[in-house]
Curated annotation (Swiss-Prot):
Lineage, broadest ranks: Eukaryota, Metazoa, Chordata, Craniata, Vertebrata
UniProt source species: Bos taurus (Bovine)
Compartments where found: Cytoplasm, Perinuclear region; Cytoplasm, Cytoskeleton, Cilium basal body; Cytoplasm, Cytoskeleton, Microtubule organizing center, Centrosome, Centriole; Midbody
Role played: May play a role in the regulation of cytokinesis. May play a role in signaling by stimulating protein glycosylation. Induces neuritogenesis by activating the Ras-MAP kinase pathway and is necessary for the survival of cerebellar neurons. Does not appear to play a major role in ciliogenesis.
Entry's family note: Belongs to the ataxin-10 family.
GO cellular component labels: centriole; ciliary basal body; cytoplasm; cytosol; midbody; perinuclear region of cytoplasm
Gene3D superfamilies from the UniProt entry: Leucine-rich Repeat Variant
Keywords linked to the UniProt accession: Cell cycle, Cell division, Cell projection, Cytoplasm, Cytoskeleton, Methylation, Phosphoprotein, Ubl conjugation
Protein name: Ataxin-10
Any one Gene Ontology BP term: cell division
């Protein structure tokens, strides 16, 4: 006569399979832990049993890493590992008691070691990929809103796990490892990233490849951009494509729906120093684009994005004052505008005033946008700043700006920023107003163009007066 089966264990009134010895028992636990009441009443002994199964099954993975011929025998072990991770993952959802119990058993270290073994196997098996993903989900859940677990995850996972997973070909593995990194990061751990820049750059690359994934985006905007030291170190080591991605996210943060906070302002001032100094040093690289061989030069395109960032930063009142007095910035912008203007006049190239507007009205050439933004930046830097207004005059920038619009007045984007710049240059500045009035009289400024821009010249006795018309500028 067969021995009677032991009665099933109970989880505070919920029937539980016991002992947990096989796949069906683990699957039953996984299903039970989908409900909060079962998670809240789970005994610690359950998690010890799951850990024992996980450790036993991991031995097969270790063997396969040493002997590749053993990979084909992994199927049953991978099934058990996957279900262990699913069970633990579900148990941790909104349950700090379970998070603490599982952590205190040493499960996090076992899980991280196993995940690193998965990466070593380098074989394409759906079952391996599923176990890999579930392991990362477990680490994300045990660390969620639990600082003690975050510390243990960081201790075991940094930097090897992130170096192994953030550049993985599987999109879900990249997303889940990004979730773990986002959850675990704090100000102290950010300093460790400065010594492991490859991880930070891998996050930027992950966002570049998966812009729809929220975790890499949040890591960059909520953590990286709050650390000027990290951004500076990253920028120096990045490829130009990665720089463009980072600068795009910086723009998104500045122009986003939520205004910069008081804490953000000093940080973005530090970014402004990096962006402005880099632009001043490297902006002439853009002239490479005048050559047909360099029309897609990544370094030049990254420099164009620096200008886009400067335009948005100078549109922010908290950042404008710093950049208005930044050494050499205004002079370099005017100098570059002149060089581009001459290049566009001398030959047919990417800076020439031809065929730059698409049928839908968008500027089709990044170079045309660059010229517009140079003029926009001059206008921003001269906003209510007499010193900069006078400096533009001294550098013969006013005729240059007017001539830029005259050559290609079919471009509404360029015309818009010329109007804006001229208004800022002439506001409360009689010297600049007189200059434009005299240019009109001498035929150096087109009266019809000035009228389109909302200005007209009036003669009062021996004086020429530049005044605004009541008409809206015709853009």
């Amino acid at each position: 006569m067969a021995a009677p089966r032991p009665p099933p264990g109970r989880l505070s009134g919920v029937m539980m399979p016991a002992p947990i010895q096989d796949l069906e028992a683990l699957r039953a636990l996984t299903a039970l832990f989908k409900e909060q009441r079962n998670r809240d009443t789970a005994p610690r002994t359950i998690f010890q049993r799951v850990l024992d199964i996980l450790k036993k099954s991991s031995h097969a993975v270790e063997l396969a890493c040493r002997d590749p011929s053993q990979v084909e025998h992994l199927a049953s072990s991978l099934q058990l590992i996957t279900e262990c991770f699913r069970c633990l993952r579900n148990a941790c959802i909104e349950c700090s008691v379970n998070q603490n119990s599982i952590r205190n058993l040493g499960t996090i270290g076992v899980a991280v070691d196993l995940i690193l073994l998965f990466r070593e196997l380098r074989v394409e098996q759906d079952s391996l990929l599923t176990a890999f993903r579930c392991g990362l989900q477990f680490l994300g859940n045990i660390a969620s809103r639990n600082e003690d677990s975050q510390s243990v995850v960081w201790m075991h996972a940094f930097p090897e796990l992130f170096l192994s997973c953030l550049n993985h070909p599987d999109r879900k593995i990249v997303a889940y490892s990004s979730m773990i990194l986002f959850t675990s990061l704090n100000s102290e751990r950010m300093k460790e990233l400065e010594e492991n820049l490859n991880i930070a750059i891998d996050v930027v690359e992950a966002h570049q490849k998966q812009p729809e994934s929220e975790w890499p985006f949040l890591i960059i905007t909520d953590h990286f951009l709050k650390s000027p030291e990290l951004v500076k170190a990253m920028y120096a080591k990045m490829s130009n494509q990665e720089r463009v991605t980072l600068l795009d996210l910086m723009i998104a943060k500045i122009v986003g729906d939520e205004p910069l906070t008081k804490d953000d302002a000093p940080v973005f001032l530090s970014h402004a120093e990096l962006i402005a100094s880099t632009f001043v040093d490297q902006c002439k690289i853009v002239l490479k684009l005048t050559s047909e061989q360099h029309t897609d030069d990544e370094e030049a395109l990254a420099t164009i994005r620096l200008l886009d960032v400067l335009c948005e930063k100078t549109a922010n009142t908290d950042l404008l004052g710093y950049l208005q007095v930044f050494p050499g910035l205004l002079e370099r912008v005017i100098d570059l505008l002149r060089l581009i203007h001459v290049a566009g006049n001398d030959s047919t190239n990417i800076f020439s005033a031809c065929a730059s507007i698409k049928a839908d009205g968008d500027v089709s050439s990044v170079a045309e946008g660059f010229k517009s933004h140079l003029i926009r930046l001059i206008g921003n830097l001269c906003y209510k700043n007499k010193d900069n207004q006078d400096k533009v005059n001294e550098l013969d920038g006013i005729p240059l700006i007017l001539d830029s619009c005259g050559l290609d007045d079919s471009n509404p984007f360029l015309t818009q920023w010329v109007v804006y710049a001229i208004r800022n240059l002439t506001e409360d500045n009689s010297q600049n107003q007189d200059l434009i009035a005299k240019m009109e009289e001498q035929g150096l400024a087109d009266a019809s163009l000035l009228k389109k821009m909302g200005f007209e010249v009036e003669k009062r006795g021996d004086k020429l007066i530049l005044k605004s018309t009541s008409d809206t500028p015709q853009l």
